[in-house]
Amino acid sequence: MQLKLEHFNIKIGQHKILLNIADAKELGVNPGDRVRIRGRESISAIADTTDDMVPPGTLGVFSEVYEHFVNWDKPVEVVPAFRSKSASVIKKMMDKKPVVQEEIKTLVNDIVEENLSEIELSAFITSSYIHGMTDDEVEWLTRAMIESGDTIEFDTHPIMDKHSIGGVPGNKISLLVVPIIAANGLLIPKTSSRAITGAGGTADLMEVLCPVEFSSQEVKEITEKVGGALVWGGATNIAPADDKLIRVEYPLSIDPYYQMLASIMAKKGAIGADNVVMDIPVGPSTKVPTVQEGQKLARDLINLGHRLGMNVECAITYGSSPIGRKVGPSLEVREALKVLESMEGPNSLIEKSAALAGILLEMGGAAPRDRGKEIALETLRSGKALEKMKQIIEAQGGDPKITSADIQVGQYTADILASADGYVIEFDNKWIIEIARLAGAPNDKGAGVAIHKKMGESVKKGDPILTIYAEKEFKLETALATAQRTNPIVVEGMLLKRIPGTYGFQ
């Protein structure tokens, strides 16, 4: 059937089209069926129907489909599409039947090419969440994800990389680790994410200083020029299947374990990483609650890395309270720059950054065994890491002269005060993140929270224990009300409760 295009300028995150009910009946297409659209290109899309949004003879297309037909002024041919082979692969996985490598590859290709509906994707995600995957299947999934998008091939090796499992607010260490590694002569092209449920991913933070959206080729050029890069992975077309899976995982609030392994390692494989250090924060409100679970995750990452030809080391790190004392893009960037400028900053930030950078320096041969942390600290003290950070900022289109004093934070503030003398005995990471998000982070770069008291520290009644920053007054009010209701930082005196004797004094 020949239909003229009508563009709906809306991005919905998938290939979807609208058919008039009359045209759909003639084609034999029901809502949720696939169709093949042929014009300048040939693509598949999921059909929906309407009796009034598009007239007969017209095909309504959303932006993701329209991108394939920009400036195409002729009718397109629309025909029913055959059922994807991946549907039967997903059915096998749901039935706990073994699959082969070619089936996994077909599945990933169909995900990237938008040949699967969200229902089918949800079935795949739920199946792997419930039934798990074998080591072979995880390796095949990872390799297919690498091959599905752009890859970077460097002429110089080794290539270093670092990844944090997440779940800890204020984890800004990449802003220190990357320049430390690059300042010691190793290449580290760090592709990072934006925050999905957090108050600021590394890409959100770096965007305070310079652009972060670059093609894979540009990432290679920046890295080869200055030794390192801190960019948003979503702009590179590296492992694009991952973004499409995340789109479905998010509303389900699940992150299947084996898909998480594949997602992490696919991004490392796509940039050609030889040596990778994994930061696994452990604590009650992190993604990895116990040391035992952290050790299992470490073993699985190391094993998968070995299968893919990567050397992986893991660091189990303390995750019960934030890294540093600031949460939110501009606040965190200011804190990180102060460390680079003068070593002035929280010990938790300096120690963790130096420890992880030290492991990478040893893995890359830039430091003898057990001296990596010492060399990382010296790189910070000497100003070499700061100079390298300035080079990275400039290479990515930012101002290399920017300092911590130049970083602007939200103009609206409110303090949470200690209700009694005592000590901080409880710290809820999840509510700290939520309060920062309600204040506007990460979209409002100046929003977030400053933490004045951490676990075990003493306080006096009326001392500020938390300051909320916002760029908009109504967001400050919402964040403040939530902080007062949830009490994310609990203060108690040394005497928790007095229990009187039954018989009184004699």
Curated annotation (Swiss-Prot):
InterPro entries listed in its UniProt record: AMP_phosphorylase, Asp_de-COase-like_dom_sf, Glycosyl_Trfase_fam3, Glycosyl_Trfase_fam3_N_dom, Glycosyl_Trfase_fam3_N_dom_sf, Nuc_phospho_transferase, PYNP-like_C_sf, PYNP_C
Report keywords, A-Z: Glycosyltransferase, Transferase
Q: From which domain of life does this come?
A: Archaea
Q: Which residues make up the binding site for AMP? A: 167, 193-198, 202, 263, 287
Q: Which reaction does it catalyse?
A: AMP + phosphate = alpha-D-ribose 1,5-bisphosphate + adenine; CMP + phosphate = cytosine + alpha-D-ribose 1,5-bisphosphate; UMP + phosphate = alpha-D-ribose 1,5-bisphosphate + uracil
UniProt enzyme class: transferase
SUPFAM superfamilies, A to Z: ADC-like (SSF50692), Nucleoside phosphorylase/phosphoribosyltransferase catalytic domain (SSF52418), Nucleoside phosphorylase/phosphoribosyltransferase N-terminal domain (SSF47648), Pyrimidine nucleoside phosphorylase C-terminal domain (SSF54680)
The active site is formed by 255 (proton donor)
Q: Which Gene Ontology terms describe the biological processes this protein takes part in?
A: AMP catabolic process; pyrimidine deoxyribonucleoside metabolic process; pyrimidine nucleobase metabolic process
- GO cellular component terms, A-Z: cytosol
Keyword Transferase set for record:
yes
**A GO molecular function held by the record:** pentosyltransferase activity
Q: What is its EC number?
A: 2.4.2.57
Q: Which PANTHER family match?
A: THYMIDINE PHOSPHORYLASE
The entry assigns this protein to a family as follows: Belongs to the thymidine/pyrimidine-nucleoside phosphorylase family. Type 2 subfamily.
Primary role: Catalyzes the conversion of AMP and phosphate to adenine and ribose 1,5-bisphosphate (R15P). Exhibits phosphorylase activity toward CMP and UMP in addition to AMP. Functions in an archaeal AMP degradation pathway, together with R15P isomerase and RubisCO.
What name has this protein been given in UniProt? AMP phosphorylase
